[in-house]
């Protein structure tokens, strides 16, 4: 699978533009796991190339079991009907010079796209990293996901180096 690595250097605190009717909170309890899995599977189901379906055990093993997991690192966007419409997680990737914050699994429901939810979630994640003293955010996305690549470029992420 060809993966694009992108990064953004933050030169000032990120500006968070709120979305009308959307509230963001952090992971609260086990009820969030089922809603998150549903969101991820819905958001990525038509991706080309496709992403395999996630399960609740996947969430517990790949998200919650991560060494730096805290509820504060998972951002959940809800609409006025309390439906989960978007999510992003902040993870830390280890490197020789210490941990680096990474944007992980940004997802927005297809019927809630182009409303500014993804942009707001990215800004909130960047703000959380900024408050912890980090000035660069990295991410990986599949090279075939053109819409994702266009979005990340629009919010200031630049290509690093492709890997296999």
Regions found by a protein language model. Name each.
Residues 71, 93-103, 113, 132:
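A conserved beta-turn-beta hairpin within the catalytic core of GNAT-like acetyltransferases
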Residues 1-21:
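Acyl-donor-binding surface of acyltransferase catalytic domains
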Residues 44-63:
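Conserved GNAT-fold acetyl-CoA-binding loop/helix
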Residues 76, 83-92, 100-102, 107:
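Conserved beta-strand in the GNAT
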Residues 108, 114-127, 131, 150-154:
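Conserved acetyl-CoA-binding loop-helix of GNAT-fold acetyltransferases
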């Amino acid at each position: 699978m060809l993966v694009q690595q992108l990064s953004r250097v933050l030169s000032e605190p990120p500006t968070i533009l709120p979305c009308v009717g959307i509230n963001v909170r952090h992971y609260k309890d086990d009820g969030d796991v089922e809603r998150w899995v549903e969101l991820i599977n819905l958001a990525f189901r038509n991706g080309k190339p496709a992403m395999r379906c996630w399960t609740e055990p996947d969430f517990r093993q790949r998200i919650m079991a991560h060494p730096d997991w805290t509820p504060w690192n998972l951002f959940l966007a809800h609409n006025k009907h309390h439906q989960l419409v978007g999510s992003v997680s902040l993870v830390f990737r280890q490197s020789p010079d210490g941990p680096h914050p990474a944007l992980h699994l940004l997802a927005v429901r297809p019927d809630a796209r182009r409303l500014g939810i993804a942009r707001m979630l990215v800004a909130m994640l960047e703000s959380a990293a900024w408050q912890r003293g980090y000035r660069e955010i990295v991410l990986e996305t599949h090279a075939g996901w053109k819409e994702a690549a266009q979005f990340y470029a629009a919010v200031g992420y630049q290509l690093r180096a492709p890997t296999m």
